Design a protein with these regions (language model features):
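Carbohydrate-active catalytic/glycan-binding domains of CAZyme proteins
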Residues: 1-286
């Protein structure tokens, strides 16, 4: 099938052995009951095979709705899926799943969510620092605190659990491209993704709502590490109703930003945008 035919949010692409693996929030009702996750495979980012079922919840699984934003990470020879889940009366959280193949089947690896159990959280991603120490970077959701934040916590080396408390880094309202005119005063944080530039700068991409709709931009760590402090780029990368993105390098060596756009269901699709790494930051290729 064509990429334009795949309804998907929060796209995440991994290039393995000459094949593009596309993960994301799939299904025609991601806002309701969760059924699992599917993936797709492509040679050219235009034509895809699939869907391939990569995760289906076991009977008694703790969550039953809002199965969101699966990211597949290669780590120490294993394939790990970071994904967010929700149930009535239970805070949304990011759990870690594991498989021996990029198409799964993925099974529970952490004991429930790794994110704080009393926080409404989503969109956990893996960051491994220069010493090989793993962290989860995630969103503390606006539905609980109104001005959503980005936070991180250290992980055990086997990715089974948190190895320390969560630390909040910055709030959505600190972004100059955030929609500060929102009448109810809420500010969204979505989809953090860490990237080290060719010049050694550590960037964090994340999404919120700007004046023209859903938008994605980035912050720069002034220390070069996960602890920050984090300073925003003045302008977003994309602010026309698209976001929750990540970066990957295609077969030709071109850096690609993938986002979903538009941001309305059921019309969301994966979009692939060429990006220039300037050493200090990122710009979209004209």
């Amino acid at each position: 099938m064509l990429c334009s035919e795949i309804q998907i949010r929060d796209p995440y692409v991994v290039l393995l052995d000459g094949k593009y693996y596309l993960y994301g929030t799939t299904g025609n009702n991601c806002w309701g009951k969760g059924y699992g996750f599917d993936a797709y495979i492509s040679d050219d980012l235009t034509h895809f095979d699939g869907p391939f079922p990569i995760f289906r919840p076991r009977p008694g699984f703790w969550a039953d709705k809002n199965f969101w934003a699966p990211e597949m990470h290669l780590y120490r020879g294993g394939y790990y899926l970071f994904a967010s889940f929700k149930a009535d009366g239970v805070c949304r959280g990011t759990q870690i799943l594991r498989a021996d193949h990029p198409l799964g089947p993925f099974e529970e690896w952490s004991d429930g969510p790794v994110t704080p159990r009393d926080w409404e959280c989503l969109d956990g991603t893996l960051y491994v620092d220069g010493d090989g120490k793993p962290y989860m970077v995630f969103c503390h959701e606006w539905v609980q605190i109104k001005d959503g934040t980005i936070a991180y916590l250290p992980l055990t080396d086997d990715l089974r659990a948190a190895a320390g408390p969560a630390v909040e880094l910055f709030a959505a309202s600190s972004a100059p491209w955030n929609n500060h005119d929102d009448p109810d005063g809420t500010h969204v944080t979505d989809g953090p993704f860490l990237y080290r530039t060719s010049g050694g700068k550590l960037l964090m991409l994340w999404s919120t709502f700007g004046k023209h709709g859903y938008a994605i931009g980035y912050y720069v760590s002034q220390s070069g590490g996960i602890e920050g402090p984090w300073v925003p780029a003045e302008q977003p990368l994309f602010d026309r109703d698209g976001g929750h993105g990540m970066l990957f390098t295609d077969k030709s060596g071109q850096l690609i930003l993938t986002i979903h756009s538009p941001n309305d269901t059921p019309n969301e699709r994966a979009v692939f945008l060429p990006v220039i790494d300037t050493g200090d930051g990122l710009t979209l290729r004209a």
